[in-house]
Amino acid sequence: MKLTCVVIVAVLLLTACQLITAEDSRGTQKHRTLRSTARRSKSELTTRCRPSGSPCGVTSICCGRCSRGKCT
């Protein structure tokens, strides 16, 4: 019974701390790079393959073929 009360009080305390912290940080953003995906242009989002002459590898897809690390 005692342990249950301690757990309930701890959960309530942590919840209150989170709510207070969330209210204080409203309107401020420390890590602006997290939302950098919203700034991408439409051409960047629709381009799925790399043009010839670009470097290629596992993470990049060529419009043609990947030969010796370059798109052809």
From Swiss-Prot:
Transmembrane segments: none annotated. GO terms for molecular function: calcium channel regulator activity; ion channel inhibitor activity; toxin activity. Residues 1-22 form the signal peptide. Expressed by the venom duct. Coiled coil: none annotated. It is found in: Secreted. Residues 23-48 form a propeptide. Keywords: Calcium channel impairing toxin, Disulfide bond, Ion channel impairing toxin, Knottin, Neurotoxin, Presynaptic neurotoxin, Secreted, Signal, Toxin, Voltage-gated calcium channel impairing toxin. Belongs to the conotoxin O1 superfamily. This is Omega-conotoxin-like 15.
